Amino acid sequence: MNCGHRALYGRSVSGSHTIKDNDQVTIEFASSYRRYTTCIMRTVLVGSASSVQRNMFNVVSDAIVAMTDAAGPDTPLGNIDDAHRRVFDEAGHKVHRYSACGYSLGATFRPSWMDVPPMIYSGNPLLCEPGMVFFLHAMLANTDAGYAMSFGHTLVITDNGREVLSGLPIELASNS
């Protein structure tokens, strides 16, 4: 969990920080069952969302939908990141996006939610196959405005497409 300006870092940073009014909090939860891992990521806003944050949320939402739609059997992993890049770049966020948008999850011990390779990056030729599990994350770090917005979920590739393993809706979590 990162909050305030540290939400821009994308991944957890150690140390304490008091959550303040109008902070942004990036939360990543993971859970393991019989050594299989799943995770979700959300940015939660304490207070009201600014117009910049609402725009970033809309772009991140569009990106995660496009990325999810791009995942399927016999599809190169790179196609998922191409969808990620297309949405962010067309919305003017090329400089605010990360260079990869997810990774595989597997049955590991000690439980870990990052089973690499493979990372999901543009040009990755590895084909998705039924039974493969991936964590997709759409993350923006707008250092100019001081805002972050992240959304991530776990999916499994099926014979006919994909199944998202979280039932949580894609919505902006804020007090507004």
Q: Language-model features: where?
A:
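Active-site neighborhoods and metal-handling regions in enzymes and metal-associated proteins
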Residues: 1-176
